[in-house]
């Protein structure tokens, strides 16, 4: 095991807006990138906790498109679907609302929006990523740290692969963190998120590279 007192160099270019009701800054944040927005979310919890309705109200002057149903351990099929919308609708910015899976999927959607081939190519060979749409996130579950890193993990059931990728183009431009959005998360998933946070911290000292 490495010496846990090792020096390190830490940098994240993501702007973090932390606090209650920071979502109210969303129109200004997204407006800096354009008016066509792709909203990406998972199983629909944002409709139960009111975030979805709030976003609709705030973005009434925007052209809002949606990709819902992003899976835990997001699949490349969801990435493909999102990239298709981005290309067909000339999306300016992607808004990811959810936990790490939604954010990971959204990162590769941003990459694939400028790629003519299959999105899976970008996962297995990050050098093919040359440009990405701007990504803004609203976090609803504290766990992986995907809201301010450049990592993404995507699954491909057809090849039975689950691959992680790191690319500096995948840093979210802005992440909105309102702790009140995590209050509806049940005890089981809150505990799992805490374990996830700790494991990601510990692995930095145990894994080379």
Which residues are covered by each model-predicted region?
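A short, small-residue-rich loop immediately preceding and capping a beta-strand
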Residues: 86-126, 132-140
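Hydrophobic/aromatic beta-strand patches that form the interior of the parallel beta-sheet core
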Residues: 65, 95, 134-138, 174-177, ...
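Conserved active-site and cofactor/substrate-binding residues in soluble primary-metabolism enzymes
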Residues: 21, 50, 54, 74-77, ...
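Carboxylate- and glycine-rich phosphate/diphosphate-binding segment that chelates Mg2+/Mn2+
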Residues: 151-209
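A gly/ser-rich beta-alpha-beta helix-loop segment of oxidoreductase catalytic cores
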Residues: 135-160
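ATP/NTP phosphate-donor binding region
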Residues: 1-93
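Short, well-ordered, mixed-charge alpha-helical segments that flank or form enzyme active sites
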Residues: 103-105, 142-148, 162, 183-186
């Amino acid at each position: 095991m490495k010496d846990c007192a090792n020096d390190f160099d830490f940098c994240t270019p993501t702007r973090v807006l932390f606090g209650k009701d920071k979502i109210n800054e969303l129109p200004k944040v997204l407006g800096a990138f354009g008016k066509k927005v792709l909203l990406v979310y998972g199983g629909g919890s944002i409709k139960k906790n009111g975030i979805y309705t709030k976003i609709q109200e705030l973005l009434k002057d925007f052209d809002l498109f949606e990709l819902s149903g992003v899976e835990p351990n997001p699949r490349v099929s969801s990435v493909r679907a999102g990239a298709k919308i981005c290309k067909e609708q000339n999306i300016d910015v992607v808004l990811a609302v959810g936990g790490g899976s939604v954010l990971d999927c959204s990162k590769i959607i941003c990459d694939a929006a400028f790629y003519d081939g299959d999105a899976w190519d970008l996962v297995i060979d990050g050098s093919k990523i040359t440009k990405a749409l701007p990504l803004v996130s609203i976090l609803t579950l504290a766990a992986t740290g995907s809201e301010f890193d450049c990592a993404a993990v995507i699954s491909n059931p057809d090849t039975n692969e689950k691959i992680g990728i790191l690319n500096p183009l995948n840093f979210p431009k802005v992440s909105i963190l309102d702790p009140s959005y995590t209050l509806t998360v049940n005890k089981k998933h809150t505990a799992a998120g805490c374990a996830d946070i700790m494991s990601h911290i510990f692995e930095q000292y145990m894994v080379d590279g």
